[in-house]
């Protein structure tokens, strides 16, 4: 069975893993998922991630992060969906929680946080927001 939105699957697995108190989750690998995980790691929302191969299938192991037993990520939500893409110019990128959260943006220079996209002067597709 093909998956219609692999990025939403990643976000849902992160949300469910943290709700269950898991230390790590495993997701099928893709370049976009790796790029999103890299941004989450750089911004301090996950402890880390690594590529693993089990039974010939490439996966990503995401190490979830907690602070005093509570998940670091309060809310992670998909913005641009396959049926309704959301693009924003560099001046229109959302400020999540007044700058305390991040939006992950896919630009022509790669996947990055909204802060970095503003600093390099790029707009793009707003993939998700993290609070």
UniProtKB/Swiss-Prot annotation:
What does UniProt give as GO cellular component? ribonucleoprotein complex; ribosome
Alphabetical GO biological process terms: translation
Molecular function in Gene Ontology: rRNA binding; structural constituent of ribosome
Under InterPro entries, the record lists: Ribosomal_uS8 (IPR000630), Ribosomal_uS8_CS (IPR047863), Ribosomal_uS8_sf (IPR035987)
One Pfam entry for this protein is Ribosomal_S8
| Keyword terms of this UniProt record | Ribonucleoprotein, Ribosomal protein, RNA-binding, rRNA-binding
Query: What is the documented function of this protein?
Result: One of the primary rRNA binding proteins, it binds directly to 16S rRNA central domain where it helps coordinate assembly of the platform of the 30S subunit.
> NCBIfam families this protein is in?
PRK00136.1 (NF001109)
Summarize the subunit comment: Part of the 30S ribosomal subunit. Contacts proteins S5 and S12.
Tell me the protein family, please. Answer: Belongs to the universal ribosomal protein uS8 family.
Task: Report what the protein is called.
Answer: Small ribosomal subunit protein uS8
Species in which this protein is naturally found: Methylococcus capsulatus (strain ATCC 33009 / NCIMB 11132 / Bath)
The gene coding this protein:
rpsH
């Amino acid at each position: 069975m093909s998956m219609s939105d692999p990025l939403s699957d990643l976000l849902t697995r992160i949300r469910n893993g943290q709700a269950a108190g898991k230390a790590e989750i495993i997701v099928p690998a893709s370049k976009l998922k790796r790029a999103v995980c890299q941004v989450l790691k750089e911004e301090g929302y996950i402890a880390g991630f690594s590529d693993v191969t089990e039974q010939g299938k490439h996966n990503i192991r995401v190490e979830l992060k907690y602070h005093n037993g509570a998940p670091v990520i309060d809310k992670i939500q998909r913005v641009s969906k396959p049926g309704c893409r959301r693009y924003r110019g560099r001046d229109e990128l959302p400020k999540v929680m007044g700058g305390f959260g991040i939006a992950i943006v896919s630009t022509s220079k790669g996947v990055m946080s909204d802060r970095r996209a503003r600093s390099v002067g790029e707009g793009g597709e707003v993939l998700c927001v993290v609070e």
